A protein has these predicted regions:
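Short regulatory helix/loop adjacent to the ATP-binding pocket of P-loop NTPases
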Residues: 1-13, 26-32
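Hydrophobic/aromatic beta-strand patches that form the interior of the parallel beta-sheet core
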Residues: 12-15, 156
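Conserved catalytic cores of phosphodiester-cleaving nucleases, focusing on short active-site segments
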Residues: 1, 17, 182, 186
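Accessory nucleic acid-recognition modules appended to NTPase machines
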Residues: 53-188
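Acidic/polar active-site rim loop that often engages polyanionic ligands
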Residues: 5-9, 18-19, 41-44, 65-69
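Conserved AAA+ ATPase small/helical "lid" subdomain
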Residues: 33-66
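Gly/Ser/Thr-rich beta-alpha loop segments that engage phosphate groups in nucleotides
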Residues: 11, 45-46, 91, 99
Protein backbone atom coordinates (compact mmCIF):
# COMPACT_ATOMS: atom_id res chain seq x y z
CA UNK A 1 0.00 0.00 0.00
CA UNK A 2 2.92 2.35 0.67
CA UNK A 3 3.99 2.26 -2.96
CA UNK A 4 1.38 4.97 -3.58
CA UNK A 5 3.34 7.29 -1.29
CA UNK A 6 6.61 6.44 -3.00
CA UNK A 7 5.20 7.51 -6.36
CA UNK A 8 2.83 10.26 -5.20
CA UNK A 9 1.21 12.07 -8.09
CA UNK A 10 2.71 9.71 -10.68
CA UNK A 11 -0.19 7.37 -11.25
CA UNK A 12 -3.15 5.55 -9.84
CA UNK A 13 -3.13 2.72 -7.35
CA UNK A 14 -4.80 -0.40 -8.71
CA UNK A 15 -5.59 -3.20 -6.28
CA UNK A 16 -5.87 -6.59 -7.96
CA UNK A 17 -7.95 -9.03 -5.96
CA UNK A 18 -7.66 -12.80 -6.28
CA UNK A 19 -10.17 -14.36 -8.65
CA UNK A 20 -13.77 -14.23 -7.49
CA UNK A 21 -15.64 -17.53 -7.37
CA UNK A 22 -17.36 -16.70 -10.68
CA UNK A 23 -14.01 -15.90 -12.32
CA UNK A 24 -12.51 -19.06 -10.84
CA UNK A 25 -15.36 -21.17 -12.28
CA UNK A 26 -14.78 -19.68 -15.74
CA UNK A 27 -11.40 -21.45 -15.83
CA UNK A 28 -12.15 -24.47 -13.63
CA UNK A 29 -12.70 -27.69 -15.56
CA UNK A 30 -15.15 -29.58 -13.40
CA UNK A 31 -18.56 -29.38 -11.82
CA UNK A 32 -19.57 -26.44 -9.64
CA UNK A 33 -19.59 -28.43 -6.38
CA UNK A 34 -16.03 -29.66 -6.86
CA UNK A 35 -15.11 -26.15 -7.98
CA UNK A 36 -16.52 -24.64 -4.80
CA UNK A 37 -14.59 -27.14 -2.66
CA UNK A 38 -11.39 -26.39 -4.55
CA UNK A 39 -11.95 -22.63 -4.31
CA UNK A 40 -12.68 -22.76 -0.58
CA UNK A 41 -9.51 -24.79 0.00
CA UNK A 42 -6.98 -23.19 -2.37
CA UNK A 43 -8.52 -19.79 -3.10
CA UNK A 44 -8.32 -17.74 -6.26
CA UNK A 45 -4.74 -16.53 -6.66
CA UNK A 46 -4.06 -17.12 -10.38
CA UNK A 47 -0.55 -18.48 -9.74
CA UNK A 48 -2.11 -21.20 -7.56
CA UNK A 49 -5.22 -21.81 -9.68
CA UNK A 50 -3.04 -22.66 -12.68
CA UNK A 51 -1.01 -25.27 -10.77
CA UNK A 52 -1.78 -28.97 -10.98
CA UNK A 53 -2.13 -31.17 -7.96
CA UNK A 54 -3.05 -30.51 -4.36
CA UNK A 55 0.53 -30.73 -3.08
CA UNK A 56 1.81 -28.21 -5.61
CA UNK A 57 -1.00 -25.76 -4.82
CA UNK A 58 -0.48 -26.10 -1.06
CA UNK A 59 3.29 -25.62 -1.39
CA UNK A 60 2.82 -22.52 -3.57
CA UNK A 61 0.42 -20.97 -1.05
CA UNK A 62 2.62 -21.74 1.95
CA UNK A 63 5.64 -20.31 0.16
CA UNK A 64 3.71 -17.20 -0.89
CA UNK A 65 2.50 -16.68 2.67
CA UNK A 66 5.82 -17.14 4.45
CA UNK A 67 8.27 -15.83 1.87
CA UNK A 68 6.27 -12.90 0.53
CA UNK A 69 3.54 -11.77 2.91
CA UNK A 70 5.07 -12.56 6.28
CA UNK A 71 8.62 -11.56 5.41
CA UNK A 72 7.54 -8.31 3.74
CA UNK A 73 5.21 -7.34 6.59
CA UNK A 74 7.94 -7.92 9.18
CA UNK A 75 10.68 -6.22 7.19
CA UNK A 76 8.65 -3.24 5.99
CA UNK A 77 7.20 -2.50 9.44
CA UNK A 78 10.32 -3.43 11.43
CA UNK A 79 8.41 -5.95 13.54
CA UNK A 80 10.52 -6.96 16.53
CA UNK A 81 8.37 -9.71 18.02
CA UNK A 82 7.62 -11.90 15.02
CA UNK A 83 6.26 -14.64 17.29
CA UNK A 84 3.43 -12.43 18.53
CA UNK A 85 2.62 -11.32 15.00
CA UNK A 86 2.48 -14.96 13.88
CA UNK A 87 0.32 -15.89 16.87
CA UNK A 88 -2.10 -13.12 15.92
CA UNK A 89 -2.21 -14.45 12.36
CA UNK A 90 -2.98 -17.92 13.71
CA UNK A 91 -5.82 -16.57 15.85
CA UNK A 92 -7.32 -14.66 12.91
CA UNK A 93 -6.88 -17.66 10.61
CA UNK A 94 -8.68 -20.00 12.95
CA UNK A 95 -11.51 -17.55 13.69
CA UNK A 96 -12.48 -16.00 10.35
CA UNK A 97 -15.73 -14.12 10.54
CA UNK A 98 -15.73 -13.93 14.34
CA UNK A 99 -16.42 -10.62 16.04
CA UNK A 100 -13.30 -9.37 17.80
CA UNK A 101 -11.33 -6.25 18.64
CA UNK A 102 -7.78 -5.47 19.82
CA UNK A 103 -8.82 -5.50 23.49
CA UNK A 104 -10.36 -8.97 23.23
CA UNK A 105 -7.31 -10.21 21.36
CA UNK A 106 -5.02 -8.74 24.02
CA UNK A 107 -6.96 -10.61 26.69
CA UNK A 108 -6.62 -13.83 24.69
CA UNK A 109 -2.86 -13.33 24.51
CA UNK A 110 -2.65 -12.62 28.24
CA UNK A 111 -4.72 -15.67 29.17
CA UNK A 112 -3.38 -18.22 26.70
CA UNK A 113 0.22 -17.08 26.22
CA UNK A 114 0.90 -15.03 29.37
CA UNK A 115 1.95 -12.32 26.92
CA UNK A 116 2.17 -8.63 27.75
CA UNK A 117 1.23 -7.50 24.26
CA UNK A 118 -0.83 -4.30 24.24
CA UNK A 119 -4.03 -3.61 22.36
CA UNK A 120 -2.15 -0.81 20.52
CA UNK A 121 0.42 -3.31 19.24
CA UNK A 122 -2.37 -5.62 18.11
CA UNK A 123 -4.09 -2.68 16.40
CA UNK A 124 -0.82 -1.91 14.57
CA UNK A 125 -0.40 -5.54 13.51
CA UNK A 126 -3.99 -5.65 12.21
CA UNK A 127 -3.21 -2.49 10.24
CA UNK A 128 -0.11 -4.15 8.76
CA UNK A 129 -2.21 -7.13 7.64
CA UNK A 130 -4.81 -4.85 6.08
CA UNK A 131 -2.19 -2.65 4.40
CA UNK A 132 -0.68 -5.76 2.81
CA UNK A 133 -4.14 -6.79 1.54
CA UNK A 134 -3.90 -10.06 3.46
CA UNK A 135 -7.05 -9.43 5.50
CA UNK A 136 -9.92 -6.97 5.49
CA UNK A 137 -12.09 -5.86 8.35
CA UNK A 138 -15.85 -5.52 8.23
CA UNK A 139 -17.22 -2.77 10.46
CA UNK A 140 -20.73 -2.98 11.83
CA UNK A 141 -23.07 -0.32 10.47
CA UNK A 142 -25.55 -0.25 13.35
CA UNK A 143 -23.14 1.52 15.72
CA UNK A 144 -23.18 5.23 16.52
CA UNK A 145 -20.94 7.71 18.29
CA UNK A 146 -18.23 6.58 20.71
CA UNK A 147 -19.14 2.92 20.29
CA UNK A 148 -17.17 2.88 17.00
CA UNK A 149 -13.88 3.00 18.89
CA UNK A 150 -13.86 -0.50 20.37
CA UNK A 151 -16.76 -2.16 18.57
CA UNK A 152 -15.77 -5.65 17.47
CA UNK A 153 -15.14 -6.17 13.77
CA UNK A 154 -15.06 -9.27 11.63
CA UNK A 155 -11.83 -10.08 9.82
CA UNK A 156 -11.76 -11.91 6.51
CA UNK A 157 -8.87 -13.12 4.38
CA UNK A 158 -8.60 -11.68 0.90
CA UNK A 159 -7.90 -15.24 -0.25
CA UNK A 160 -9.00 -18.40 1.56
CA UNK A 161 -6.04 -20.31 0.17
CA UNK A 162 -3.69 -18.02 2.09
CA UNK A 163 -5.75 -18.49 5.24
CA UNK A 164 -5.66 -22.27 4.85
CA UNK A 165 -1.93 -22.24 4.13
CA UNK A 166 -1.36 -20.32 7.36
CA UNK A 167 -3.01 -23.05 9.41
CA UNK A 168 -1.49 -25.84 7.31
CA UNK A 169 -4.82 -26.85 5.73
CA UNK A 170 -5.88 -28.49 8.99
CA UNK A 171 -8.94 -26.56 10.12
CA UNK A 172 -11.67 -26.48 7.51
CA UNK A 173 -14.92 -24.97 8.74
CA UNK A 174 -17.33 -24.83 5.86
CA UNK A 175 -19.68 -22.21 7.34
CA UNK A 176 -16.90 -19.75 8.20
CA UNK A 177 -15.17 -20.36 4.88
CA UNK A 178 -18.43 -19.77 3.02
CA UNK A 179 -18.94 -16.53 4.96
CA UNK A 180 -15.45 -15.44 3.85
CA UNK A 181 -16.24 -16.33 0.21
CA UNK A 182 -19.49 -14.35 0.37
CA UNK A 183 -17.73 -11.36 1.95
CA UNK A 184 -15.14 -11.39 -0.83
CA UNK A 185 -17.85 -11.64 -3.51
CA UNK A 186 -19.78 -8.71 -2.03
CA UNK A 187 -16.62 -6.63 -1.62
CA UNK A 188 -16.03 -6.60 -5.36
Amino acid sequence: KDIATEFAGRGDEVHMYPLSFAEFMSVYKGDKYMGLSEYMLYGGIPLVVLRDGAGDKAAALQNLFSEIYLRDICKHNRVKNIGELEDLLNILSSAIGSLTNPEKLKNTFRTAKKSRITSNTIRKYLGYFEDSFLIESAQRYDIKGKAYIETPKKYYFSDLGLRNARINFRQFEQTHSMENVIYNELRM
